[in-house]
C-alpha cells in the first residue's frame, strides 16, 4: 500500500488531525537574532530574526520540541518548517544558497519525530507534510501601476525554485507535499508543475495537498478567482485534498468551506486562524472556543483533515481528539463529490459544459489571422484598443476567447505573453476562459504559463506523427489544459467523412490509453472547410463535418466537437449577410448533431429564424448537399444579395452595439465619471473630464468631488465583497488617467493664482521588518500612485532606522507601513488607537483595505479636510482607549443594541 493509499484509507475511516501554527509557537520561545543565526548563519548579511526556516539548522531543538508538542497533542500530520525555504523568498534574507540544506534538514527533523511517535503507537501512524508556501511574489499581478503587462516573476522561475525545494523535501523523507496559503492560482500551478517534474525525476509518487486562502467576503483569491474557478484550474493535477487555511477564523470560513465541499471532487482540509486578532493584534480565541466551531465542520461531514493556522498552538490541536469522536466512535468524515465527465474550464470564474448546456461561443476576433483590425492594432502596439475587441466579445456573449498571434511579421511568443498579461489584468475580460491558439508549440506553452485559469489549446494533431502528438499531450496534461484535436494526420487534412472519423478515433485512443488524457478535455475539430467555392469536390464539406460530429458524439464518449465556423463561408468574404446567414444555418444543423462549441463572431446578429424562408431553403440545401445544383444556387443568391446591398436596398450587418450597455452615457457627468471609475472604463474619460471642467471652476474640485466620491463607493463595494481586487486595481488605473488629464489644468490654475493647491505630495511606503510579503504593500502603492501620489517604495523587511532615515531625507507628507498578509480587520483600528497613535505627535490613520488608502491619504493632506479629519480620528482613538481601559477593569459584555450604537464609521 502506498503512502497515499494509507492516508486515504484513514481518511475514509475518520477525520485526520493536522498540526497548528509554526510561527505562533516559535514566538513563544522568545528567540534572539543570535538564535536565528547560530554558527551556521553567523555571516549572513542583514537581520535574520523572523526568518523562521533557519531554525531547523540553528535551533533544531526548538523546532523539534514544537513537532513533539503537536504530536503529543494528537496530530496525525505535522508540517516541516520550510514554508519559505525556496530561493525566491530567501533572496530577501540573502540566504538563497542554503535552500537545499534547509529543506532536507526540515524534512529529516520532522521525519525523526513522526517516526518516533509511530513506533510508540503503530495503530496511530504519523505523517510528515512538506510545507511549500506561496512565495512573496505573484505571477498574476503587475508590480507597476503604469505597466499592467509587467510581472516581477515568471512561471518558469517559480517552477524552477519550487522544484529545487520539492526535490530536497523528498530527499529528506516527507510523506506529503502541502502547497499552502495559495493566493495566486498561477503560483500554485507552477508548484504543481514542479511537483510533477520532481516526482518523475526522482521516480516517486507522493500525495499532494492544496490549501488556498480567500482574500475577501466574496470568497475570491487575492488574484481574483472564485473557489470553483480555482479548483477547475488545478483539477488536472490529481491532488489528494483541497482546502482552506489562514484568511479568517473558523466561523467566518464556514460558508466558503461549505461551498468547496459541495462541488470539489477531493478530500477536504481546513485549518483556520484562532479567530480574529483583537485590538492588540493578539488572537484571543481560546482552544475550546475554536474547537466548538471546528466541531460543526466535523459534525456536518464537511472535512477530512482539520488543523490550525495563525494564532493556534498545541493546546488548540489537543482539543481536536475530542471532537472527531462520539461515544468512542469516530464521526463520519466528508465523502468527496463524485467526479463527472463534464468539461470544466475557468478564467476568474468557472465555466462548465454540462449535458444540455447551450452552445459554447468562442470569440474569434482576437486572432491576427481572422481579424485585420486586430492585426493592425497589434502591429501598431495599440494594445488598449486591442483589448476593447476582447471586451466587446465578452459583452456580446463569448464564453471563451480565442487568442492567436501567428503572423510572419510578429514575434508571436512575445506578443502572446504581453497581450495575455494585459488581458488577465482586466477582470471584465479575464473572467472567461481562454483558448491559446498557435501553430507554434513554444507560443502555446508560453501562453499557458501566463494564465491562472484552465484554458483550451488550439491545437494538437497527428500531422507530425504519434511521438510528437503524445509529447504535446503529456505537456498539456502536466500544466492543465483541455485541447482541440485537429482531424489531421501524417497523410494530411481530413476532408471526407471517412477520414475525419478515422483520425479522430485514432487520436482518441492514443490520448485516453497512452496519456490518460481525460476524454472530457478532448475537443475534436473535424475541419470546417469552405463550401460553394465553384469546385464540386468541396460541396459535401459541410455535410461531412455534420455527419462526423454525430459519429464522434456517439462513438467517442465524453469528447466534444468544435470548429472554426467562419471557414465555412470564406468564399463569400465581403458579403457579410450571406456569410452570417450561411454560418447560422450550418450551426443549426451541426449543433443538432452534437457540436457543442465553436469559434464564432459573437457580435453577429443573424440567427436561423431571421432568414427569409425562400433564402433559407437555398442555404439549407447547400449545407446539407441535397443536390449537385445546391452550391450554384447559393452562389447566385449571394451575387443577387450583394448587388442589392451595394445598391443600398439589401440586408447588411452593422456593428451590433448593446444599447443598454451604453445607456450610462446619457447620465450626468458626475454619474458618468462614477460609472467609468467603477467599471474601469477609460474610453470616454477625456471628453467627460473636459465637460466637468466646464461645470467645476477649479480642476482640483473634480478630484475632490466626483472622482473621490466614486473611489469611496468602490471602497464600500470592495469591503462588502461586491468588487474584488483586480477590479479595484483597474478602477485605480482609470482614476490615474483622469488625474493625468486634470494635472496640467491644476498646474495652470496654480500659476494663475486660481488655486494654491499643488499636486498631491509624496508618500513613503514600506513593509515592516520581519515581513517579507510585499503583495499587500504593492497593491496599496498601486492605488496611491493611480490617485496622483508620488510613492517612494522602500520594499520589504525594512528596519525602523531605514524608514526614519528615508523619512528625514525625502520629507514625505505621509509614511505608510504594511505588515499583514491576511485581509485587514476592523479590529486593527483599535491596535492603531492603543499602540500606535498614543506614541506619535502627528496624526495616525488606519485603512481597512487598499481602496480606502487614497481617500484617507487625501483627507490627511488636504487643507480643507485635514483638521476636521484629524480631530475625528483623535476623538475616535480617545473613545477606543477609554473603552479598552474600562474593559480591562471590568471585562463584561455589552448588549447587541449598544454594540450597534458603537459601530465604527471611519469613512
Summary of predicted features, one role per range:
Residues 1-885, 907:
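Domain-level signal for soluble alpha/beta catalytic cores
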Amino acid at each position: 500500500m502506498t503512502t497515499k493509499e494509507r492516508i486515504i484509507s484513514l481518511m475514509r475511516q475518520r477525520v485526520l488531525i493536522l498540526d497548528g501554527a509554526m510561527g505562533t509557537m516559535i514566538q513563544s520561545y522568545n528567540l534572539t537574532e543570535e538564535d536565528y543565526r547560530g554558527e551556521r548563519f553567523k555571516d549572513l548579511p542583514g537581520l535574520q530574526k523572523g526568518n523562521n526556516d533557519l531554525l531547523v539548522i540553528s535551533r533544531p531543538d526548538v523546532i523539534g520540541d514544537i513537532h513533539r508538542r503537536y504530536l503529543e497533542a494528537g496530530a496525525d500530520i505535522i508540517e516541516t518548517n520550510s514554508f519559505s525555504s525556496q530561493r525566491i523568498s530567501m533572496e530577501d534574507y540573502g540566504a538563497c544558497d542554503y535552500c537545499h540544506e534547509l529543506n532536507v534538514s526540515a524534512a529529516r527533523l520532522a521525519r525523526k519525530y513522526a517516526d518516533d511517535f509511530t513506533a510508540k503507537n503503530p495503530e496511530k501512524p504519523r505523517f510528515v507534510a512538506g510545507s511549500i508556501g506561496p512565495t512573496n511574489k505573484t505571477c498574476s499581478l503587475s508590480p507597476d501601476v503604469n505597466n499592467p503587462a509587467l510581472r516581477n516573476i515568471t512561471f518558469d522561475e517559480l517552477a524552477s525554485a519550487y522544484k529545487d525545494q520539492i526535490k530536497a523535501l523528498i530527499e529528506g523523507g516527507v510523506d506529503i507535499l502541502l502547497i499552502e496559503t495559495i493566493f495566486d492560482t498561477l503560483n500554485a500551478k507552477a508548484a504543481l508543475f514542479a511537483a510533477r517534474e520532481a516526482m518523475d525525476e526522482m521516480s516517486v509518487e507522493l500525495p499532494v495537498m492544496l490549501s488556498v486562502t480567500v482574500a475577501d467576503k466574496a470568497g475570491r483569491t487575492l488574484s481574483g478567482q472564485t473557489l470553483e474557478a480555482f479548483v477547475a484550474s488545478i483539477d488536472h493535477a490529481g491532488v489528494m485534498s483541497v482546502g482552506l487555511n489562514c484568511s479568517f477564523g473558523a466561523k467566518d470560513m464556514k460558508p466558503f468551506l461549505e461551498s468547496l465541499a459541495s462541488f470539489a471532487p477531493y478530500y477536504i482540509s481546513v485549518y483556520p486562524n484562532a479567530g480574529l486578532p483583537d485590538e492588540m493584534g493578539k488572537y484571543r480565541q481560546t482552544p475550546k472556543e475554536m474547537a466548538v466551531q471546528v466541531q460543526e465542520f466535523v459534525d456536518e461531514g464537511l472535512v477530512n483533515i482539520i488543523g490550525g493556522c495563525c494564532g493556534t498552538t498545541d493546546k488548540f490541536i489537543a482539543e481536536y481528539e475530542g471532537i472527531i469522536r462520539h461515544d468512542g466512535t469516530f464521526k463520519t468524515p466528508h465523502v468527496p463529490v463524485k467526479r463527472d465527465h463534464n468539461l470544466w474550464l475557468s478564467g476568474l470564474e468557472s465555466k462548465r459544459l454540462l449535458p444540455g448546456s447551450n452552445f459554447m461561443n468562442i470569440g474569434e476576433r482576437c486572432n491576427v489571422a481572422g481579424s485585420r483590425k486586430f492585426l493592425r492594432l497589434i502591429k501598431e502596439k495599440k494594445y488598449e484598443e486591442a483589448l476593447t475587441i476582447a471586451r466587446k466579445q465578452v459583452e456580446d456573449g463569448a464564453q471563451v476567447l480565442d487568442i492567436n498571434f501567428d503572423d510572419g511579421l510578429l514575434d508571436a511568443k512575445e506578443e502572446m505573453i504581453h497581450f495575455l498579461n494585459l488581458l488577465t489584468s482586466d477582470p471584465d475580460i479575464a473572467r472567461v476562459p481562454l483558448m491559446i491558439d498557435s501553430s507554434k508549440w513554444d507560443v502555446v506553452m508560453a501562453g499557458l504559463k501566463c494564465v491562472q485559469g484552465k484554458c483550451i489549446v488550439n491545437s494538437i494533431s497527428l500531422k507530425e506523427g504519434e511521438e510528437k502528438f503524445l509529447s504535446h499531450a503529456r505537456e498539456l496534461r502536466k500544466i492543465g489544459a483541455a485541447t482541440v484535436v485537429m482531424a489531421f494526420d501524417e497523410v494530411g487534412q481530413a476532408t471526407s467523412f471517412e477520414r475525419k472519423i478515422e483520425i479522430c478515433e485514432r487520436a482518441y485512443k492514443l490520448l485516453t490509453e497512452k496519456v490518460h488524457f481525460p476524454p472530457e478535455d478532448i475537443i475534436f475539430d473535424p475541419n470546417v472547410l469552405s463550401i460553394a467555392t465553384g469546385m464540386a469536390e468541396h460541396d459535401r464539406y459541410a455535410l461531412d463535418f455534420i455527419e462526423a460530429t454525430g459519429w464522434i458524439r456517439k462513438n467517442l464518449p465524453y469528447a466534444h466537437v468544435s470548429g472554426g465556423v467562419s471557414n465555412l463561408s470564406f468564399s463569400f468574404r465581403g458579403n457579410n449577410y450571406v456569410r452570417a446567414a450561411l454560418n447560422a444555418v450550418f450551426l443549426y444543423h451541426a449543433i443538432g448533431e452534437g457540436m457543442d462549441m465553436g469559434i464564432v463572431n459573437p457580435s453577429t446578429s443573424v440567427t436561423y429564424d431571421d432568414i427569409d424562408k425562400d433564402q433559407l431553403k437555398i442555404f439549407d440545401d447547400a449545407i446539407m448537399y441535397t443536390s449537385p445544383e445546391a452550391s450554384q444556387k447559393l452562389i447566385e443568391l449571394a451575387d443577387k444579395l450583394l448587388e442589392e446591398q451595394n445598391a443600398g436596398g439589401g440586408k447588411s450587418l452593422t456593428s451590433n452595439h448593446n444599447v443598454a450597455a451604453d445607456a450610462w452615457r446619457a447620465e450626468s457627468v458626475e454619474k458618468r465619471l462614477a460609472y467609468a471609475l467603477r467599471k474601469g472604463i477609460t474610453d470616454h474619460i477625456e471628453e467627460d473630464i473636459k465637460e466637468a471642467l466646464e461645470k467645476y471652476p477649479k480642476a482640483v474640485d473634480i478630484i475632490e468631488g466626483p472622482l473621490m466620491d466614486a473611489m469611496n463607493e468602490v471602497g464600500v463595494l470592495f469591503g462588502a465583497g461586491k468588487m474584488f481586487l483586480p477590479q479595484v486595481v483597474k478602477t485605480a488605473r482609470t482614476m490615474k488617467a483622469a488625474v493625468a488629464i486634470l494635472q496640467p489644468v491644476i498646474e495652470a490654475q496654480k500659476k494663475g493664482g486660481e488655486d494654491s493647491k499643488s499636486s498631491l505630495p509624496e508618500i513613503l511606503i514600506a513593509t515592516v521588518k520581519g515581513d517579507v510579503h510585499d503583495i499587500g504593500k504593492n497593491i496599496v502603492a498601486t492605488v496611491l500612485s493611480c490617485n496622483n501620489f508620488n510613492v517612494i517604495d522602500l520594499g520589504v523587511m525594512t528596519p525602523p532606522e531605514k524608514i526614519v532615515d528615508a523619512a528625514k531625507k525625502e520629507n514625505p507628507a505621509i509614511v505608510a507601513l504594511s505588515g499583514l498578509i491576511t485581509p485587514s480587520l476592523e479590529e486593527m483600528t483599535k491596535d492603531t488607537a492603543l499602540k500606535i497613535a498614543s506614541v506619535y505627535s502627528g496624526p495616525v490613520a488606519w485603512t481597512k483595505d487598499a481602496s480606502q488608502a487614497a481617500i484617507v491619504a487625501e483627507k490627511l493632506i488636504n487643507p480643507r479636510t485635514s483638521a476636521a479629519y484629524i480631530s475625528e480620528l483623535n476623538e475616535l482613538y480617545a473613545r477606543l482607549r477609554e473603552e479598552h481601559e474600562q474593559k480591562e477593569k471590568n471585562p463584561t459584555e455589552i448588549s447587541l443594541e449598544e454594540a450597534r450604537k458603537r459601530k465604527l464609521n471611519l469613512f
